[in-house]
Regions:
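A short beta-strand-loop-beta hairpin characteristic of the jelly-roll/cupin
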Residues: 125-158
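Histidine-centered metal-chelating micro-motifs
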Residues: 123, 145-146, 162, 167-171
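Ligand-binding loop in jelly-roll beta-barrel domains
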Residues: 97-98, 108, 157-158, 166-192
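A short glycine-rich, His/Asp/Glu-containing loop-to-beta-strand
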Residues: 80, 85-127, 184-186
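DNA major-groove recognition helix of helix-turn-helix/homeodomain DNA-binding modules
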Residues: 25-40, 46
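Short alpha-helical DNA-recognition segment
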Residues: 1-13
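Short acidic-glycine-tyrosine-enriched beta hairpin
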Residues: 102, 150-167
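Short, charged recognition helix plus adjacent turn
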Residues: 43-95
Length: 194
């Protein structure tokens, strides 16, 4: 795997053991190579209509108490239809970016995320453009985010949105001293793969 995605075996091992956080680029490369969805990499298992795992503030997912419940038989917080803010599955990336899944269950067709860029946060740790299948849509909620798509660079401000074919090389970065909060949707051309 490491050779196929151009990273070191030790990095893969550290990611597997929770000792290192991947960049967005490495995360997408792993998902693509494994032909897995990002939901799979979030680490939760789909049961019925809902994911029975939640983030616990340390960047790791653990099964919910009473994991035998499904969305239709007593799943808390909206019966599998509502994702409560404090119970989102999260991934903290090495490059100062945090992804919080906004859906209460797995959907291999789409990634619906709140993305938080810390000051100096960047979509890839190597600061190289990323590309993957699908269409990408973003809306800036707060802060200012630099976006590069193809050969164009944009500064996105609160209320601005962006949409493009995500097979075009792209990257994002925060050059300000404040967090950037954005809502991001990636619709996959080949469901089940990132």
């Amino acid at each position: 795997l490491a050779r196929r995605i151009s990273c070191s075996p030790s990095l893969i091992s550290q990611i597997e053991r929770g000792l290192s956080a991947p960049s967005v680029g490495i995360l997408y490369a792993i998902a693509t190579e494994l032909r897995a969805s990002l939901d799979f990499l979030f680490g939760a298992t789909a049961v019925g209509d809902a994911m029975l795992a939640t983030a616990h503030g340390d960047g790791h997912l653990r099964p919910e108490n009473g994991a035998a419940h499904t969305a239709r038989s007593g799943w808390p917080d909206g019966h599998g239809l509502v994702q409560r803010a404090g119970r989102r599955a999260t991934i903290d990336l090495a490059s100062g970016v945090r992804w919080e899944r906004l859906t209460p269950g797995a959907d291999e067709r789409v990634d619906f995320l709140e993305v938080i860029y810390e000051p100096s946060g960047h979509s890839t740790d190597a600061r190289r453009p990323l590309r993957h299948d699908g269409q990408e849509y973003g809306l800036i909620i707060s802060g200012r985010l630099q976006a590069s798509v193809g050969f164009e660079t944009f500064e996105l401000e609160p209320g601005d949105s962006i949409a493009f074919d995500s097979s075009v090389p792209h990257q994002y970065w925060n050059t300000t001293g404040a967090d950037v909060h954005a809502v991001w949707v990636v619709v996959h051309a080949h469901p089940g793969r990132a």
